[in-house]
Amino acid sequence: MINLKNKKIGVLCGGTSSEREISLMSGKAVYNAIKKLGFKTVLIDVNKNVAQKLVKEKIDVAYITLHGTPGEDGTIQGMLEVMGIPYTGCGVFSSSASIDKIISKKIFESAKIPTAKWTIIEKLKPFEEIEYPVVVKPASQGSAIGISIVKNKKEFEKAVKLAFSYEDRILVEKYIKGIEITAGVLNGKPLPVIEIVPKGKFYDFKSKYTVGQSTHIIPARLPEKVLKKIQNIALKVYDEFRCNGTCRVDMIVDQNNDIYVLELNTLPGMTQTSLFPDAAKSMGLSFEDLVLEILKSAK
């Protein structure tokens, strides 16, 4: 566990991804919490000059609140390791593997972690006939950006066009009807399971970041045995991806209480509508307490 006494903490946020605004919101919330905790801190908007900023500010520990690239793909983690600056959250491997939904699927399958059937579609390449309904996702976007649920060929063509506007590889997976849930892990220990009830069709960008657009039920309305199984799956994902500090595993539970892992989030949001702080709060951890626990895991 890192000694934080007299350390200056740089909160890294912003970046250049499609999730920039969410990252700035997370960063500001964490920055304010660190100030309340009594530590020296500075908010750093990440750009190509971030290394110079870290040196200029004499940062001892980096608290990463970047969503998307370069914070969730291992880029910033690799740079910080080269610079010898301890940082919060997952390392290079878990970050780079989890941001790519296709690589994640392959790891899930090799580790026998339950996940929905899937296929890859690449731009300008032929693909197999699709059985509807399916979920279409860009391979490495977060915050539900570019995701569509489709029931027929016409909707599929529109969804593929949208997903390809973000990148050249997309993931198409079987749509599983059920309860949307998420399970967080904090420093190797499971948090209470959250049931997500969005106002819209599914937990999209608007539902995630607009107050009142989704309800978080803690714990999820599932049998205790199922909740325990969900937590164990989350811990297995945490271990298989060699996570550190925090992660959040999104899943679907169908009508038979079968569980399917959707994806791993190595940098859970820290905004007022975010799931991870809600789960921590339900077990008695204030936002400041949560930030301190995450800081202690920096390495």
Predicted regions and their residues:
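ATP-binding N-terminal substructure of ATP-dependent carboxylate-amine bond-forming enzymes
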Residues: 1-93, 97-99, 103, 110, ...
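Active-site nucleotide/adenylate-binding loops and adjacent lid/helix of ATP-dependent enzymes
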Residues: 2-13, 56, 97-179
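Phosphate-binding site of ATP-dependent enzymes
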Residues: 11, 151-232, 253-260
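Hydrophobic beta-strand scaffold residues
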Residues: 41, 86-87, 115, 134, ...
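Glycine-rich phosphate/pyrophosphate-binding beta-alpha loops
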Residues: 144, 199, 265-279
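Conserved metal-phosphate-binding beta-hairpin within the catalytic cores
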Residues: 174, 183, 238-270, 280
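Peripheral (often C-terminal) accessory segments that flank ATP-dependent C-N-forming ligase machineries
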Residues: 253-255, 293-299
